């Protein structure tokens, strides 16, 4: 598995929340601005979100990416639809890119 880079879409409303888990019911860790560069470490399936990107394409996905902004960042989950990774994160990282698989490898 390899990490993947991304950027928060520049037309997101204000700040995008990072959370402790893959859904809006999880506590907010912090909020990041549009245009923020990110590294996607893995993804999990969770609550479905919908967002229309600057090109006018509406994306709906239940993927939530575990993202960091630097090596010192503890990270958190952000709905994949708010992040421009250049494609579908589940295809880019594959089955081995799920956070569950990553946790198993780290144990």
Where do the language-model regions lie?
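Solvent-exposed loop/turn segments at secondary-structure junctions
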Residues: 24, 38-39, 45-48, 71-74, ...
């Amino acid at each position: 598995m390899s990490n993947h880079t991304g950027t928060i879409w520049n037309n997101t409303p204000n700040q995008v929340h990072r959370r402790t888990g893959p859904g809006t019911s999880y506590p907010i860790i912090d909020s990041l601005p549009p245009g923020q560069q990110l590294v996607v470490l893995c993804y999990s399936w969770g609550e479905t979100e919908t967002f229309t990107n600057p090109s006018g394409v509406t994306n709906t996905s239940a993927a939530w990416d575990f993202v960091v902004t630097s090596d010192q960042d503890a990270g958190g989950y952000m709905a994949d639809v708010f992040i421009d990774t250049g494609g579908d994160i589940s295809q880019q990282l594959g089955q081995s890119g799920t956070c569950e698989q990553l946790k198993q490898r780290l144990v």
